[in-house]
Amino acid sequence: MSAVFRKEFRSGLTSMTGAIFMAFVLILNGLFVAYYNFISASPHFEYAVIAASFLSLLAVPVLTMRSFAEERHSKTDQLLYSLPLTATQIVLGKFFAMIAIFAIPTAVVCVYPIISEAYGGGEVNLATAYGVLLAYYLLGCAVIALCMFLSTLTESQVIAAVLSLGVILVVYFLKSFSSMVPTSEIASLAVVLVLALACGFIIYAATKSYIAGGVSGLVLVIAAVVVYVVKSSLYEGLIGKILSAVSIFSAIESFANGVFDITCIIYYLSLAALFIVFTVQSFEKRRWC
């Protein structure tokens, strides 16, 4: 795994995509810190980080698009399969390399609270500032894991980047859509059924097994219908709750109140782990295709 990590980390640092990614993250965070903490003379560093989180992470597809799509396109993925490593070790090596690259601009941003306190709008709460930076970094790790999984679904870097960017945009605006959706029980059931089928498709895409995808989707559909029959009141307003829950960019907003939200930390770690598992399954399935 260390060999994969060193190769990917070195490649990320020496390639144009890695440089563009790190520069974009630093520039976006720098602009928001300059506006919030210097121009507006606000001591709340966490506001700048939260405001910059979405825009700065739009660059993640640039970093992840080549992780697996390029390997498939150039047929070098066969070399990965020949290594004396498991699929999990290969995926983790690539993932750790990408989050290590993301850690570089994040480490630079960690200096900003000290600069803001010295030359900005007042005394900065360093505990809150570094708490939100931890959440920001873990949010980035979760987004990297998501985009890495999407990269395994295609052999085109461009398609991988566009697909990842589209998913990030959809996820970001989910919370805004939550207030616009119907709250009736039957509408919620319909959405849950669609999500159940979508989960079945995702499992199929990751495993390339019609049985795994079909059975999973069918089980979820049956479970949703049974719950509706037994206690339909659970479905009232469920669509909005689901949209708010999967909007990963809104979870970090709790840090704006100076609260270290441990549930947010666990949420991001769980998301990263989930998409790493999906990536491993998708990568392992192609070994036998």
Model-predicted segments: where are they?
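Short aromatic-rich membrane-water interface segments that cap or initiate transmembrane helices
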Residues: 126-135, 250-263
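Helix-loop-helix units of permease transmembrane domains in multi-pass membrane transporters
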Residues: 67-97
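Secretory targeting signals
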Residues: 29-36, 40-48, 52-55, 96-166, ...
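Short amphipathic alpha-helical coupling elements at transmembrane boundaries
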Residues: 3, 7-11, 78-82, 152, ...
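Transmembrane helix segments
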Residues: 35, 157-253
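Hydrophobic alpha-helical transmembrane segments
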Residues: 1-70, 129-134, 161-162, 190, 201-208, 216, 228-238, ...
